[in-house]
């Protein structure tokens, strides 16, 4: 999934197309794959967070004999990605699923009898979701509090706000949003919903704004930002999917293959960092990034939303006995 970023307008056959989105750290990601695979290699890529298809476009263009497995939990995003990749349709297999559900049995059911050599996860929320989906990911407009990346499954943010008990809401806001005012916000939500349900982004944003004293508002950010992040993570179970998905994908990755993951906040990055570190200790994987690769200043200037991106990379160097997989290791200092 491509993260929030600037838009560019493409043309096809002389006709202007709908603006599409700039792929965060696209140059760096492509360069890593170029260093590990030859241009003419029949590489099988897996884009576990297809988004608008921007990263996949780069891979298919650079590696003319490659194929790609395109996955996204949102059917609308998958459709948009397929439209963007229409020139490569014979080399694309699309699967509407969360990357945490990808395994060899699923791939085989789609006629894929190989394992991927190059895997990408872009964990950022897309510009489409934030500003064009109408699902309440942003408080720029008054929208229903949905926040589901797959609009056809799971509880909405509105249901969570109006059903969950106070202590559970407080824990969500504190754990996923690192919000110091979590207790007070949860208390006010519970009292407010006794009179009227909280159902729109404006209602929630205004409620939070009134609770947090202005002197404690984060510089340059709306005071409800952390609450919206926490709700989105809970609605979509994002952290659990990252943890479980990495286990499946690292086991699935072909010998000699490379997995690259872009994270956008500390909760995501901590899971990726610890998972990659633990697998590297098994001697079946090589950590290619002791420290994450950050966006260049040029990219940040061009696309300020990329500022928080962190890219981590792992290569599979040999098969790992199942009994050693997902083993817990002594924690290194954070």
UniProtKB/Swiss-Prot annotation:
Catalytic activity: cytidine(1402) in 16S rRNA + S-adenosyl-L-methionine = N(4)-methylcytidine(1402) in 16S rRNA + S-adenosyl-L-homocysteine + H(+)
Annotated localization: Cytoplasm
Record-stated family: Belongs to the methyltransferase superfamily. RsmH family.
UniProt xrefs under Pfam families: Methyltransf_5
Gene3D superfamilies named among the record's database cross-references: Putative methyltransferase TM0872, insert domain, Vaccinia Virus protein VP39
Cellular component annotations (GO), alphabetically ordered: cytoplasm
Highest taxon of the lineage: Bacteria
Keywords: Cytoplasm, Methyltransferase, rRNA processing, S-adenosyl-L-methionine, Transferase
Top EC class for this record: transferase
GO BP terms, alphabetized: rRNA base methylation
Protein name per Swiss-Prot or TrEMBL: Ribosomal RNA small subunit methyltransferase H
Keyword Cell membrane: no
Its job: Specifically methylates the N4 position of cytidine in position 1402 (C1402) of 16S rRNA.
A GO term, aspect molecular function: rRNA (cytosine-N4-)-methyltransferase activity
The keyword S-adenosyl-L-methionine appears for this protein: yes
EC number from the UniProt entry: 2.1.1.199
Residues annotated for S-adenosyl-L-methionine binding in this entry: 53-55, 72, 99, 122, 129
């Amino acid at each position: 999934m491509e993260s929030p970023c600037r838009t560019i307008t493409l043309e096809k056959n002389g006709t202007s197309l709908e603006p599409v989105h700039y792929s965060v750290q696209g140059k760096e990601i492509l360069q890593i794959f170029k260093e590990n695979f030859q241009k003419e290699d029949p590489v099988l890529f897996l884009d576990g967070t297809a988004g608008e298809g921007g990263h996949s476009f780069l891979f298919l263009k650079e590696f003319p004999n490659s194929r790609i497995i395109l996955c996204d939990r949102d059917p609308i995003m998958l459709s948009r990605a397929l439209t963007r990749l229409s020139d490569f349709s014979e080399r694309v297999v699309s699967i509407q699923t969360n990357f945490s559900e990808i395994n060899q049995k699923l791939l085989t059911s789609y006629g894929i009898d190989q394992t991927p050599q190059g895997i990408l996860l872009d964990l950022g929320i897309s510009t489409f979701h934030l500003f064009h989906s109408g699902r309440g990911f942003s408080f720029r407009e008054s929208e229903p509090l949905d926040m589901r990346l797959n609009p056809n499954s799971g509880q909405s943010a509105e249901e969570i706000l109006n059903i969950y008990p106070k202590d559970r809401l407080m824990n969500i806001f504190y754990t996923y949003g690192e919000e110091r005012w979590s207790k007070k916000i949860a208390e006010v939500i519970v009292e407010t919903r006794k009179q009227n349900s909280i159902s729109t982004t404006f209602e929630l944003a205004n409620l939070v704004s009134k609770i947090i004293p202005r002197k404690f508002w984060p510089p340059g950010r709306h005071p409800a930002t952390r609450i919206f992040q926490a709700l989105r993570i809970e609605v979509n179970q994002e952290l659990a999917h990252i943890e479980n998905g990495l286990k499946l994908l690292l086991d699935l990755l072909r010998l000699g293959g490379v997995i690259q993951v872009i994270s956008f906040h500390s909760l995501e990055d901590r899971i990726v960092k610890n998972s990659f570190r633990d697998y590297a200790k098994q001697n079946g994987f090589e950590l290619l990034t002791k420290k994450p690769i950050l966006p260049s200043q040029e990219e940040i200037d061009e696309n300020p939303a990329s500022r928080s991106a962190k890219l981590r990379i792992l290569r599979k160097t040999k098969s790992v006995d199942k009994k050693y997989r997902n083993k817990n290791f002594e924690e290194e200092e954070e």
